[in-house]
């Protein structure tokens, strides 16, 4: 997943979850102030992203998550860690 795909997925989940137009969702949008999310909404968003990426988010990783951009950075980090773990699990190609 690249940055654009991650944003589109977050945008889709938030629009469905919150019942708001996708156009209202930007990287700069504050989850609470601009989008009206509460802590339960954040848990549901993270759960959907965990399912999408296939990795779990630690509670400590949620600290400081205030904007859609922060959610994107967290998701990009998870995708990168998953790719690194997958590469480490693959046996080296025979020479």
UniProtKB/Swiss-Prot annotation:
Modified residues (O-(pantetheine 4'-phosphoryl)serine): 39
Main function: Carrier of the growing fatty acid chain in fatty acid biosynthesis.
Protein name in UniProt: Acyl carrier protein
SUPFAM superfamilies referenced in this protein's UniProt entry, alphabetically: ACP-like
InterPro entries xrefs: ACP (IPR003231), ACP-like_sf (IPR036736), PP-bd_ACP (IPR009081), Ppantetheine_attach_site (IPR006162)
Primary localisation category: cytoplasm
Alphabetized PANTHER family for the sequence: ACYL CARRIER PROTEIN, CARRIER DOMAIN-CONTAINING PROTEIN
UniProt record similarity statement: Belongs to the acyl carrier protein (ACP) family.
GO-annotated biological processes: lipid A biosynthetic process
Modifications the protein undergoes after translation, according to the UniProt entry: 4'-phosphopantetheine is transferred from CoA to a specific serine of apo-ACP by AcpS. This modification is essential for activity because fatty acids are bound in thioester linkage to the sulfhydryl of the prosthetic group.
Localisation per UniProt entry: Cytoplasm
GO molecular function: acyl binding; acyl carrier activity
Lineage: Bacteria, Bacillati, Actinomycetota, Actinomycetes, Pseudonocardiales
Domain Carrier: 4-79
Pathway as given in its UniProt record: Lipid metabolism; fatty acid biosynthesis
UniProt keyword terms in alphabetical order: Cytoplasm, Fatty acid biosynthesis, Fatty acid metabolism, Lipid biosynthesis, Lipid metabolism, Phosphopantetheine, Phosphoprotein
A Gene Ontology cellular-component term: cytosol
């Amino acid at each position: 997943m690249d940055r654009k795909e991650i944003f589109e997925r977050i945008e889709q989940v938030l629009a469905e979850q919150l019942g708001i137009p996708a156009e209202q969702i930007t990287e700069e949008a504050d989850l609470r102030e601009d989008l009206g999310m509460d802590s339960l909404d954040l848990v549901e968003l993270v759960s959907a992203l965990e399912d999408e990426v296939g990795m779990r988010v630690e509670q400590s990783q949620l600290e400081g998550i205030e904007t859609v951009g922060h959610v994107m950075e967290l998701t990009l980090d998870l995708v990168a860690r998953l790719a690194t773990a997958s590469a480490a699990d693959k046996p080296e190609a025979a020479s």
